[in-house]
C-alpha cells in the first residue's frame, strides 16, 4: 500500500508543478458565473465565488464541504466556464448514482470512474499511464469514496496538460478498500 500512496504523492507533486495551456480570462469567468447563477436562480456566496475562481486558475484543486454546502453548485459554474470557452472536460464519480447527480446538476454528462477510464478487465483500463485521456479538465466527484488503487489508476490516465478538480466530503464514510486519499490530501 505504501508504494501506491507514494506513487499518488509523486504524481500529484509532479502535476502540481506543471503549468497547463488552459486559461480563461477573469471577464469570461465572471460571465460563466453569471450564467450559472441565472440558471440556478440564486447567487453564490463569497466563499463559493472564491472557490470557483481558484479552481479555474489552479492546476490541481480540492473542493470539500459537508452535504448541502454547494459543492455541486460550484461545479456547475466551473463546468460552465470551461465549456463556454471550448475546453474539454471529463466528469467522473465512483458510483453511477453520483455520476447521474452530477449530470443533472451541471447539465454535463458524467460517468463512473471505470467507464471514464474504459474498464476492460480487473484493474485494466483503456486509459492509463501509457494512454492518457485527452481532456482539458478531469473532475472527480465524491473523491472521499475512492480508494487509493482506483485513484492511482485515474490519476495515471490524466495527461500533464490537464487540470484536476476533486470534490468530496472528507467526513463521509471512508472508501471501501485501502487508502483514504481525499482525507489525506485535505
Language-model-detected regions and their locations in the chain:
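Conserved ATP-binding/catalytic motifs of P-loop helicase motor domains
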Residues: 1-186
